[in-house]
Amino acid sequence: MSIQPGQVVTDPSDFAGTTIPELADLDSLLRCHICKDMLQTPVLTQCGHTFCSLCIREYLNKESRCPLCLAELRQNMLQKEFLVGELAACYMELRARLLETVRIPPKKVAEVVQNNSPIELDSDGEVEIIESCTGAVPGSKRGSPQVEEVEAAAKRQRTKQNGIQYMLQKKPKAVGEKVPCPICNRLYNKEFLERVHLDECLMMGTLRESGESDITVIEQQSYTAEPDSKNSHVAERRGESPVDEVVTHKESYLGSGLRVTKSRLPKLHFTSLSTSQLKQKLSELGLPTAGSRQQMINRYNHYELLWNSNFLDSIQPVGEGELRRSLLSWEATRNTDTPISSGVSSSITNMLKTNNSASTLLKSFKTDKFDKSAWSRLHGKEFRRLIRAAKKSMLEQDRGEAITAQNNELSTKASVDMESTSFRNDTNDTIDTVTDEVHEDLK
């Protein structure tokens, strides 16, 4: 991505002199390793690396390989990564405020210089930190009180360093200083690079072609696993982390293409395997062969999931011993005597053949091995009977309500008719009485 006029150029090193230098690692991970800018419209390769869509497509027009691991790559292999794109955009909106929040004020830097003992300060390192911090303060001028205070503290420190007592004191070694290998251009611990890696890299040829050996990785870890305790103590007093820990995730990502991956553990066709053959497969993987045949099938199926998820998808896979411990924990709660794997009789299906007591079914119902399909088959007749009874009850209720309404209507009509008949009878009686009276008067 080209830099536009007036665009502010950012870099992960902006966080180096802050209270949280590990943020430089996060900043690096959200950048495209082609344009070195923040990811824009990121896409994922089949080898697990992420680049800007435009950057990687332009690169693939010239070279059909991944820029990081040199694996074969074509444009039709790219996959969209919407989540990573939104994370990068969100981070860019917060980056300026985040950097301002974690930046160390010059006054605190001066206090660190005054309070630290000569044993805890390196001769050149502290002066460089002070100068970089004074230059990093926006809007600072040479004659400002803050800058003068920092310069005065640095001057006092240089005066201490000129004394004989300071010259006799043992200076600590630099922590986590990493330099690039002139052959493979990868960063290594300086001591490890000089003593081990250069000879090995010359013998193996270029690192990209041959891959890094297990011995190199183990020996490098031995050099970096125990940093100088005195420097670690100084870093803790300043509120910082040891330098070795700052770029761990970035290095893991960049070196992901060079890690040795194990082959996929295949699924087995258990119906064609005898029990002895199944035990042999488990023994080859270092897994126990105890239990029923179904338990052994469940054991292999779950270990196959653990294996492929760990060695094929993880950027930092654990060892096989850790996988076996996870399998043991799973077996303690899941792989009991009743089978649970798909394609075979489940726990409830097995109970249909052996024990259908209510207590046994209820016990199985309360566990996470509950099989809904088998439960439906077991109680299907009862469910259908209840449904029919409910429908019949509803029909009878509706019919009863209709009959009641009809009866009410008929009774209402009958009462009206009776009232009408009674009224007519009364009217006729009245007319007859009046007629009789009129006749008597006429006589």
From Swiss-Prot:
Q: What is its main location?
A: nucleus
Q: Where are the zinc fingers (RING-type)?
A: 32-70
Offer an example of a GO molecular function term for this protein. zinc ion binding
Binding of Zn(2+): at which residues? 181, 184, 197, 201
EC main class here is: transferase
Q: Where is the SAP domain?
A: 270-304
Biased composition range(s): Polar residues: 410-424
Q: Where is this region: Disordered?
A: 410-443
Tell where it localizes.
Nucleus
Task: Name the Pfam families for this protein.
Answer: SAP (PF02037), zf-C3HC4_2 (PF13923)
Its domain of life?
A: Eukaryota
Q: InterPro entries in the record, alphabetically?
A: Rad18, Rad18_fungi, Rad18_UBZ4, SAP_dom, Znf_RING, Znf_RING/FYVE/PHD, Znf_RING_CS
Instruction: Please indicate if the UniProt record lists Phosphoprotein as a keyword.
Output: no
Q: Kindly list the biological process annotations in GO that this record carries.
A: error-free postreplication DNA repair; error-free translesion synthesis; error-prone translesion synthesis; postreplication repair; protein monoubiquitination
Q: Which pathway is this protein assigned to?
A: Protein modification; protein ubiquitination
Keywords for this entry?
DNA damage, DNA repair, DNA-binding, Metal-binding, Nucleus, Transferase, Ubl conjugation pathway, Zinc, Zinc-finger
Q: Does the keyword ATP-binding apply?
A: no
* Reactions performed catalytically: S-ubiquitinyl-[E2 ubiquitin-conjugating enzyme]-L-cysteine + [acceptor protein]-L-lysine = [E2 ubiquitin-conjugating enzyme]-L-cysteine + N(6)-ubiquitinyl-[acceptor protein]-L-lysine
Q: Where are the zinc fingers (UBZ4-type)?
A: 178-206
**Which Gene3D superfamilies does its entry note?**
Zinc/RING finger domain, C3HC4 (zinc finger) (3.30.40.10)
List its EC numbers.
Answer: 2.3.2.27
User: Which family is annotated?
Assistant: Belongs to the RAD18 family.
Q: How does it assemble?
A: Interacts with E2 UBC2, forming a complex with ubiquitin ligase activity.
Record function comment: E3 RING-finger protein, member of the UBC2/RAD6 epistasis group. Associates to the E2 ubiquitin conjugating enzyme UBC2/RAD6 to form the UBC2-RAD18 ubiquitin ligase complex involved in postreplicative repair (PRR) of damaged DNA.
The record, for PANTHER family, names: E3 UBIQUITIN-PROTEIN LIGASE RAD18
Q: What is this protein called?
A: Postreplication repair E3 ubiquitin-protein ligase RAD18
